[in-house]
Amino acid sequence: RARRAVEKAIHLLEEPDDHYLLFATRLGLIKKTALSEYVRINRNGKYALRFKIEGDSLVNVRSATNEHDIVMISTTGYASRFSCGDIRASGRVSGGVYGIKVGDRKGSGGGIVAGMVAMLSADEYILTISKYGMAKRSRLGTAEKIHDTDASGAPKFEDDGSPKMVTDGYRRTKPGAKGVRTMKLDEEHHDSIISVRTIPDIEDHLFLLTKSGMMIRIRVSQTKETSGKSTRGTRVM
C-alpha cells in the first residue's frame, strides 16, 4: 500500500447544505464536491479525489459556497481568481478541472500551485510569503474598474484628460487561466512563493519558521499593503 500522509484537517458543518469542499493540486487542478458527500466516513476512509496526472498531489482543501471567490496562486507569482460558482460540482472520485495554468503548459507562468484561498469579502487580504523571506499583503478587491489615485489620494488622469482607471484588487479570470502577476520575485536567485494565507484582521500575528528551526513572530500590520501587482513586498525574515 502506498504511504499516506495527512495534508489538511478541516471542521465539518452540522448543516452542510450549499457548502462544498474544494481540492487544489500542485499541477493546477481544482475539484469541487458537495460537502454532504463527506458527512459519513467509515474507519477506512473514502476517496476524496482521483489524480488525473501522474505525479500530481494535493496542495490544499477549503470549504466554500458558490458565493466565495477562489484564488489559486503559483510559486512563480501568478494568481487566478474566479467564482466558486464557475466550477461545476462533481463526484468524489472525479479528477477536477484546471483552475490555473502552471508547469510547462503552453501560456503558463511555470512553477506549481503554492496555495488556494476562498474569500467572501472584498476587503479581506491575501498574504503571500516567498522562500527568501519577502511578504506581500494585497486586498482581494471587487475586481471592478475604479478611478486610480496617487499616494495622497488625488485622482490620476490620462494624457487626454480622461480618468485613469485601474482594477480594484485582483482581476477575475476564467478557471484554468495563467492569471495575473501578484508578486514580483527575485528570479536571479530563484525565489518562489511558498505560502498563501487569508488575513481577516491585520492585527493578527504571524509565526515564521525556517528549516533550521529559527522562529520569529510579527504583526500582520508590519507587512506592507501594496496595490501594485508587480511589487516585491517587504522583507520579514
Regions found by a protein language model. Give the residues of each.
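Short, structured "edge-of-domain" segments at secondary-structure transitions
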Residues: 1-237
